């Protein structure tokens, strides 16, 4: 599989590239960035380590080098300015994102390529990418709440002194303020979370709050997330490359799952060779269902504002 990473010079894109290199599953990685020297430096740095990992082709390039890519990962984005409103930042990122999509279309892409959107606001941009690129259904997906889910699991493991790989919990909805933790199916080692030694409602809520605000915490402490988002991106790409049919909370334009339509957000999704292949409706508590639908409404309102702004 050939993977192109747009914005691959930055911390998110470079972390994704390195995670893909360590995975040793994809055959070729192309780093594309507006800063060509930075892209070249990141590609060289990874290539230098290739003899110790896997026989992969790792290069820097332009949009023309993505014309035969099996998957294009978009990580480029703008940071918030001081005193800038959330909507103003969203609109600036939408302008940048549309220019990226236009560059992809101009250079050409495989008719069955998959596109993974990581740039924020990921749900809004995933919707726009599907509308603009004209790819088959399921070929455009966003990272969604996968990173939030991994953060949630890792923090539950930390607070309960449990093995992180045995924590099963998922966050659905918007990658943003209206995200929804699904307590009803959360478990550790097969034991319902509420019955796990040491778990309390307060511990659970505090853990979710920290997971929800981890993005801001990362910005404050180290300018932004890198390693964990890179691992999240690799998890999606590896599921596509291996056709592993993993169920992941990625963002796609909904067509009836949980009664949601014409909005991109995260629900349990089977990810395989064809991208987002199927959405699943796990049973939710009524209050979780209400929160998920509210999250959809929040996103539809924001999308309406973005579309109105042109």
Where are these regions (language model features)?
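Aromatic pocket-lining residues of Rossmann-like dinucleotide-binding sites
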Residues: 20
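C-terminal substrate-binding/catalytic lobe of Rossmann-fold NAD(P)-dependent dehydrogenases
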Residues: 133-139, 148-310
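Rossmann-like NAD(P)-binding element
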Residues: 51-114
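Conserved N-terminal Rossmann-fold NAD(P) cofactor-binding segment
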Residues: 32-69, 84, 301-307
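N-terminal Rossmann-fold NAD(P) dinucleotide-binding loop
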Residues: 13-14
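Conserved glycine-rich cofactor-binding loop
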Residues: 9
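Hydrophobic Val/Ile/Leu positions in short beta-strands of Rossmann-like dinucleotide-binding domains
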Residues: 5-6, 31
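Rossmann-like NAD(P)(H) cofactor-binding subdomain of soluble oxidoreductases
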Residues: 86-154
């Amino acid at each position: 599989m050939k993977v192109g990473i747009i914005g691959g010079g930055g911390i998110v894109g470079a972390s994704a590239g390195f995670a893909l290199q360590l995975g040793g599953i994809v055959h070729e990685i192309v780093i594309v960035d507006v800063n060509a020297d930075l892209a070249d430096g990141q590609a060289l740095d990874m290539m230098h380590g290739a003899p110790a990992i896997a026989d992969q082709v790792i290069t820097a390039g332009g949009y023309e080098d993505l014309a035969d890519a099996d998957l294009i990962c978009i990580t480029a984005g703008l940071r918030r300015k001081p005193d800038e409103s959330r909507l103003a930042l969203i609109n600036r990122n939408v302008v940048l994102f549309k220019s990226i999509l236009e560059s992809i279309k101009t250079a050409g892409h495989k008719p069955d390529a998959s596109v993974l959107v990581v740039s924020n606001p990921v749900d809004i941009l995933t919707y726009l990418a599907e509308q603009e690129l004209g790819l088959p259904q399921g070929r455009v997906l966003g990272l969604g709440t996968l990173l939030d889910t991994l953060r949630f699991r890792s923090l539950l493991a930390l607070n309960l002194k449990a093995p992180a790989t045995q924590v099963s919990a998922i966050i659905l909805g918007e990658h943003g303020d209206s995200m929804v933790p699904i307590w009803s199916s959360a478990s550790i080692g097969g034991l319902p979370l509420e019955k796990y030694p040491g778990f309390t409602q307060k511990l659970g809520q505090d853990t979710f709050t920290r997971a929800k605000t981890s993005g801001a915490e990362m910005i404050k402490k180290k300018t932004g997330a890198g390693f964990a988002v890179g691992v999240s991106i690799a998890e999606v790409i590896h599921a596509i490359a291996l056709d592993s049919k993993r169920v992941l909370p990625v963002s796609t334009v909904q067509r009836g799952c949980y009664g949601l339509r014409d909005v991109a957000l995260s629900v349990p999704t089977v990810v395989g060779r064809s991208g987002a292949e199927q959405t699943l409706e796990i049973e939710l508590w009524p209050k979780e269902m209400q929160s998920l639908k509210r999250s959809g409404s929040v996103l539809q309102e924001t999308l309406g504002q973005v579309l109105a702004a042109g």
